Amino acid sequence: MFKQIDENYLRKEHFHHYMTLTRCSYSLVINLDITKLHAILKEKKLKVYPVQIYLLARAVQKIPEFRMDQVNDELGYWEILHPSYTILNKETKTFSSIWTPFDENFAQFYKSCVADIETFSKSSNLFPKPHMPENMFNISSLPWIDFTSFNLNVSTDEAYLLPIFTIGKFKVEEGKIILPVAIQVHHAVCDGYHAGQYVEYLRWLIEHCDEWLNDSLHIT
């Protein structure tokens, strides 16, 4: 459900400034220590990519500024955002963008995500899964590139307010497994403080992965 924001919106002046006078988005790359997470996934024999998608999506639900959008020229936020993510056709080397309904229950989301990837993995269409919802955000994966900087130039008649994530190739540094993730947000709805909140919660989820990964005991 989309909830409109009323005139009491505290960032009203900021929103209008970055939507009209200085229209801009900004990007940042964070390095995530996934050493503990990687070990648990290996032990449980879980696929890495669906877990990465779950982490990014769950953190999005936590921060309202990452769910803000404009619908029919009205500013507001989605109560829930579902992840849309890229997958590679290994034969044609083309990618598709599919989506999976978000579920905070890890086991349920994991099963749905794995099933979606398997179903559409051989498609050559850009959007093979029908009925993509309006309340979704984008994730891309570049597992071949260990990047330190990344930027998307989104050119549309209207400002794209929802966040965009790009996952890079993990590397080993001083015995730690480090995963680069690029985050792009629009300054009209998201300040550096809100981006910092998102990153802090994402790192918390990774550090406490053993708690929510216990749900995977019920994956069959």
Curated annotation (Swiss-Prot):
InterPro entries: CAT-like_dom_sf, Chloramphenicol_AcTrfase_AS, Cmp_AcTrfase. NCBIfam families: chloram_CatA. This is Chloramphenicol acetyltransferase. Its EC number is 2.3.1.28. Pfam families: CAT (PF00302). Transmembrane segments: none annotated. It comes from Bacillus pumilus (Bacillus mesentericus). The active site is at residue 187. Homotrimer. Induction: By subinhibitory concentrations of chloramphenicol. GO terms for biological process: response to antibiotic. Keywords: Acyltransferase, Antibiotic resistance, Transferase. GO terms for molecular function: chloramphenicol O-acetyltransferase activity. It catalyses: chloramphenicol + acetyl-CoA = chloramphenicol 3-acetate + CoA. This enzyme is an effector of chloramphenicol resistance in bacteria.
